Amino acid sequence: MYTRYKLSILFFVINFYNILCMPLSCETECCMAGKKYDDAAIDRDLCVLLCNLQYLASSNEGIGEILQCCLSSNYTSKTREDLRNCIAKCPPLPDRGCTGECCDLRENVDSLRANNPLGCCNDYTKVSSSSLNEDDVIDCRKSDASCEDRGYLLVRNNGSAVCIPENSKNDNIGFYFGSECSDLSRKG
């Protein structure tokens, strides 16, 4: 009974630690939605502004009289309905998406992957796997067999990219990145 209790506590601690040390939490799609949201919010605000300007321009009264009318809430239901109809035609806002540092890092990872699709280690700083902490790496790829300089291409959480030798072992890194870097956890 006592052994089962210790094992369950150990299991809980390991899982909790793994959850806290995951790589990037934001996906590319979420970051793209965040960028589109900002543009869509500006477009909607401009549309609403144009509706309000059309409403003001369509009045035969002077601007002072229009402002007095609006401040005293004496405008007619017809003009108010026209304004509502105009605003209803404005584009809706999409989901907010993701923004911030996570998206900046995600963009850097996506850019590095696009610029080096094979994951070759040419022109990248070589480091030993023991010099890396598990919370320091946000992306990992194994170089393609066609690369002249092969290894594991890693992106650190500061945005820099480094390579570790192909025969490296680091149990803390390979686990998170699926099949691409799982060999890091298996080599002896």
UniProtKB/Swiss-Prot annotation:
Family the UniProt entry places it in: Belongs to the intercrine beta (chemokine CC) family. Highly divergent.
GO molecular function terms listed in the Swiss-Prot or TrEMBL record: cytokine activity
Keyword Transmembrane helix listed: no
GO CC list: extracellular space
InterPro entries from the UniProt entry: Chemokine_CC_FPV060
Membrane-crossing segments per the record: none
Keyword entries, A-Z: Cytokine
Pfam families for this protein: FPV060 (PF17614)
Protein name in the entry: Putative CC-type chemokine FPV060
